[in-house]
Design a protein with these regions (language model features):
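A structural signal for isolated positions on well-ordered beta-strands in alpha/beta enzyme cores
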Residues: 8, 36-38, 151
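N-terminal strand-loop element at the rim of the active site
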Residues: 12-16, 29-99
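Histidine-centered beta-alpha loop that forms part of the nucleotide-sugar donor binding/catalytic region
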Residues: 12, 70, 131-132, 154-158
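Glycine-rich phosphate-binding loop signature in dinucleotide/nucleotide-binding domains
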Residues: 118-125
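A short helix->loop->beta-strand "cap" motif at the edges of active sites that frequently abuts
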Residues: 63, 146-149
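A short, histidine- and acid-enriched strand-loop-helix "catalytic/donor-clamping" loop
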Residues: 148-167
Length: 172
């Protein structure tokens, strides 16, 4: 029998919701002889206001958790986004593109680098993303850089806004 496929499950969410619940149902039922799953989050949040931590719940079902550091938004990025919103208020499309360009520099590109390194060093076979496509841009770009396929879990029919997300999501 071959070794199980190594899967990195990326969740970019900030709170426990329906996506987290469906993720747990998948993880409880997945065939562990075929899939070796490690979860990757940015935040170890609680289940509800006074519930247990995500890390505790995952440990109970034997799933490892990797927490990637969250970088605080630098002042230059906050100011640049506000200036872009003000100057480009006449064009929603240009305003969104400018804000995305700023987000790419301070938040998304560093996350892509960290995820790419994690995917390569962990010898993963697949990146599974548990949030909507528009919030998973770093996952698409990291998987592409690492040469890995992606599974995107969508609980609703997504509307992709950013051209970069659309190009990444629709690659063969």
């Amino acid at each position: 029998m071959s070794a199980p496929k190594r899967v990195l499950l990326l969740d970019t969410g900030n709170e426990w919701g329906g996506g987290t619940n469906s993720m747990f149902e998948l993880l409880k039922r997945i065939d562990r002889t075929r899939f070796d799953v490690t979860c990757c989050f940015y935040k170890d949040y609680k289940k509800g206001q006074s519930g247990r931590l995500l890390s505790e719940e995952l440990a109970d079902i034997g799933i490892p958790l990797i927490l990637l550091p969250i970088r605080k938004q630098p002042l230059w990025a906050k100011l640049a986004k506000e200036v872009a919103r003000g100057l480009l208020s006449w064009s929603g499309r240009l305003k969104k593109r400018a804000v995305l360009a700023i987000e790419m520099e301070w938040r998304i590109k560093p996350r892509v680098a960290a995820l790419t390194l994690l995917l390569e060093e962990g010898s993963y076979d697949l990146l599974y993303m548990n949030n909507q496509p528009s919030s998973n841009l770093e996952g698409y770009l990291a998987a592409e850089a690492a040469g890995l396929p992606v599974v995107q879990h969508c609980r609703i029919e997504p509307t992709l806004q950013a051209a970069e997300t659309l190009r990444s999501a629709n690659r063969p």
